[in-house]
């Protein structure tokens, strides 16, 4: 049995476009849409159910936009303020129609919204995606183009729409088969809003994969869209028994028949408005998947009503995986903002500090004005209060995972740190008010433990008696850190050193100079002061070496010229001939290299060369048989080797190799 079109009580027929009509206009999809349509039809067939989620979500957004616009002009409701979404199935025409009485579109809107992707960087992002990522159903929603998911199951899509507040004869019909073009023509549409009709492909209109099964559609709505605050309705079915003659012993047969009554098939209440004690974990997970288009369940979440000077509800999620665009300029971040349950905007980045840009969720404020703009969000004291509250809540959630005795929660924190640890470190320099909270979450490998599990608190608990500082070393990777010449003295004395191998570490440590009143010391910067861990005999020997090596040190300064800021006898080397050291507050070679790669101007900075007086290569410099030319070559080689060991790059690798070869041939 066919259903009536939920908009105009007209039967939904197959599309017959009069291509000779002078009002019919044909348009070509922009390149990004064509690429996306190809992706939809060829890669996402295994996730065909998602079209229900996407089209219901779009309908909900359209109603949210109308509600928002109507706060300034309630005539837009056109005497129909009961917002709703309806889904109609027509078995004869093999169609499904999704209808809303939301904001609607005019011709220009339809061409822009359905024919282009209004997001910068989309094409580049699509080009970068690997084949495995293209199988992920969350891709579609990430671009805000969920409408196109209809082409997974439909060979043709028709859209009939009219913008709220415009006359009936300003309706628009948009039609496409998804192969590269679409047509637009004017129609008369008495009701505002949008009706999207999917003409199902044969494989999706019969058999087990059929979407003409109303029960299946209801299940998908319950799975993906139960939280939608608007009523989602379908025609009610009732059991009707066949008539039997009075007195007959034959049992009555019957069938399900459609009525003219529409029934709501979802809970129709915003999840975050309900008490947390009433919400099942599965409901939280389904809601997360719906608003983020992430196929994975979230790692953790927190749901709270905040009372005080500013009242708001927060429902915040930590994803399981970092998005591929986490570090790109086009990366979309921020929360959905509602004011008194009225949707205001997506991606309200002002509600979170940048280092928490991976957090997803919803904020519903009772105090912000309904006409709040992004500009106003940047200036509002209330928004700052909400942002600070969100940051504290997320950091508290992470701390509860990190400090839990429960192995599952510990594993969740390990997962989180592997995905988002580097982003959290940005907060050390960006959020001074929460710096201590953030520092407690940081984890590192050390010179005695390769696993990235040691916190500053753990390190302090293992410090040697008499140790006055938390020692750390930055490097490009763990292998480079473990083999760094700067570690040699610490290994000899059994002093543990934290090994930092992320590019953001050195930047972050510029802001974190102590932890729990214990200073942090980079062992590759400045002089090494082991304090009580260095005995008097060692100090006396070091002072003696300074005197005996002075002639060689002076010659090295001359040979190296402008390459080195200074040359000194080292107290930190045991096995290596030399190492490079920078002063406190100066940039390391790795940091300089990173900044140059980012195209930034880097201030001139020269390292100090420290030499090991006990190493045979350094002793060779003292040889009276050494010519001035060979001394200079050996000095340059020693400096270059120290630079390489420190993770730097040679300005002239060929010259380095030539000098090494010449010395080897002597």
Swiss-Prot record:
Keywords: ATP-binding, Chaperone, Cytoplasm, Nucleotide-binding, Stress response. Residues 594-666 are annotated as: C. It comes from the Bacteria. InterPro entries: HATPase_C_sf, HSP90_C, Hsp90_fam, Hsp90_N, Ribosomal_Su5_D2-typ_SF. Its main location: cytoplasm. Gene3D superfamilies: 3.30.230.80, 3.40.50.11260, Heat shock protein 90, C-terminal domain, Histidine kinase-like ATPase, C-terminal domain. It is found in: Cytoplasm. Coiled coil: none annotated. GO terms for molecular function: ATP binding; ATP hydrolysis activity; ATP-dependent protein folding chaperone; unfolded protein binding. Residues 1-374 are annotated as: A. The keyword Metal-binding does not apply. Molecular chaperone. Has ATPase activity. Belongs to the heat shock protein 90 family. PANTHER family: HEAT SHOCK PROTEIN 90 FAMILY MEMBER. Homodimer. This is Chaperone protein HtpG. The lineage of its organism: Bacteria, Pseudomonadati, Pseudomonadota, Gammaproteobacteria, Moraxellales.
